[in-house]
């Protein structure tokens, strides 16, 4: 099970990133004392995102974090209401998904269902 992902973000993007992850159901949590001056943490259902404010964040173009949304349509509506631009992903497993850039620049995939075979076009079960 994936426990956490660390994302570098610009120092001026912390509040905006915490708000963004909140739209996806992640809530702020207190980091351990040893790490509080270097990280801001958010969590949902045992999974954590560790936001690491830095002067020059490294943000991959295509690499991304994927999250399963318990209420997919509500999450998309909340993101749209906040002005985020959504990009449709391919329908690789007969379940809608969208991509968005968080305020820190990272690509985030919002999934309506997890990928699981049988894959479309391959039949079977």
Please name every model-derived segment.
Residues 63-90:
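Mid-chain, well-packed structural core segment of small domains
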Residues 1-18, 63-65, 117-125:
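N-terminal beta-strand motif that seeds the catalytic metal site of vicinal oxygen chelate
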